[in-house]
A protein has these predicted regions:
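Hinge/capping helix and adjacent helix->loop/strand transition within the periplasmic-binding protein
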Residues: 85-91, 106-193, 242, 247, ...
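N-terminal (or domain-start) structured segment
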Residues: 27-117, 156, 164, 180-205, ...
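A ligand-binding cleft/hinge motif common to bilobed small-molecule-binding domains
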Residues: 101-110, 174-178, 205-237
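Extracytoplasmic/secreted proteins, especially bacterial periplasmic and envelope-associated proteins
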Residues: 49, 53, 57, 78, ...
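N-terminal signal peptide c-region/cleavage motif recognized by signal peptidases
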Residues: 21-26
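Bacterial N-terminal signal peptides that target proteins for export
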Residues: 2-16
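An extracytoplasmic/periplasmic, membrane-proximal ligand-sensing/linker region
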Residues: 32-34, 177-178, 218-219, 265-326
Length: 326
């Protein structure tokens, strides 16, 4: 004889098994239609370049289009806000970035998203130092000359960025603070626009993403002063780092793949497996490194730790320079 208690228990067990089976089927069938990859940065920016390379491979491996959708504005906050509101069904993948995930929460008091509450990390895709550049026609030949000029002429030098709260903005803020100089910030809407402003002489310098910056350097429109990493890059051994002049200075740009928080875990697991395979592919890694982008492919937990650590770092910087934006 089966008691009411065991009848209830059996029903619960059956429901659990059905739920597990449904999740398995969801992951097995996924994706069954095109997937939107939301990039909160402009076409041609570092996050965009990485995402397009990886999205093409995802399309090939999983048999459905992974289509990049650039949603720009407010230092990436508009795009992240849209990602936070997306249906948690696996058909919107969101690109998180050092600026949107760890800088903006420390300088914007009223964000439309919460990096921890609204998103589930999948994997960090790349890390990359920024490239400090001036116009090719500039009289400033190196970092020491730039600092000397800034000290001799307080308030004269300017730097552009891809917008308030972006990595290029905070790289300039931290550099000026550590070098003991004053640099006037001129925000633009996109990273390519910030670089073009330097090349045309509208502003003195910028800290640009390497994929859009190097073509302008090679075209003799920009001059590279140095990378923002702690040590020189193996791919560019002749390019100095700013830390050779400003001791201890380091800023790494990075981005990664995320999902809206309530997306089924099985879908996240499947995407993680595919992304790790893609980022570990020698041809993809070579393509990325040629542009100064270093593949990562860590676990969701490791990516979450990076977000936590970087949030604490930029909180200290924002507090030290008393930076807060409406």
């Amino acid at each position: 004889m089966t008691t009411p208690f065991f009848k209830t228990l059996n029903r619960c067990a059956a429901l659990v098994l059905l739920s597990v089976a449904a999740l398995g089927a969801t992951a097995q069938d996924y994706p069954s239609k095109p997937v939107r990859v939301l990039v909160p940065h402009a076409a041609g920016s570092s996050p965009d370049v990485v995402t397009r390379i990886v999205a093409q491979k995802l399309s090939e491996r999983l048999g459905q289009p992974f289509t990049v959708d650039n949603v720009v504005g407010a230092g990436g906050s508009i795009g992240l806000g849209a990602g936070a509101k997306a249906a948690p069904d696996g058909y919107t993948v969101v690109i998180g970035h050092v600026g949107t995930l760890t800088i903006n929460p420390n300088i914007y008091p009223n964000l439309s998203y919460d990096p921890l509450r609204d998103f589930a990390p999948i994997t960090q895709s790349v890390t990359t130092p920024l490239l400090a550049v001036v116009a090719a026609t500039s009289a400033l030949k190196n970092t020491a000359e730039l600092i000397a000029d800034a000290k001799a002429n307080p308030g004269k030098l300017t730097f552009s960025s891809a917008g308030n709260g972006t990595a290029s903005h905070m790289a300039g803020v931290l550099f000026a603070s550590m070098a003991g100089i004053s640099l006037t910030h001129v925000p633009y809407k996109t990273a390519p626009a910030a670089l073009t402003a330097v090349a045309s002489g509208d502003v003195t310098m910028t800290f640009g993403g390497q994929p859009p910056a190097w073509p302008l350097v090679r075209a003799n429109r920009l001059r590279a002063l140095g990378l923002t990493s702690a040590a020189r890059a193996a791919e560019f051994p002749d390019v100095p780092v700013l830390a050779e002049t400003v001791k201890g200075y380091e800023v790494l740009d990075w981005n990664g793949f995320m999902l809206p928080k309530a997306t089924p875990v099985a879908i996240g697991t499947k995407l993680h497996r595919e992304l790790v395979a893609i980022l570990s592919d020698p041809d993809v890694a070579k393509q990325l490194r040629a542009q100064g982008l270093n593949p990562v492919a860590n676990t969701p937990a490791e990516f979450a730790t990076v977000i936590e650590r970087e949030t604490q770092k930029w909180a200290r910087v924002a507090k030290a320079v008393k930076l807060s934006l409406d």
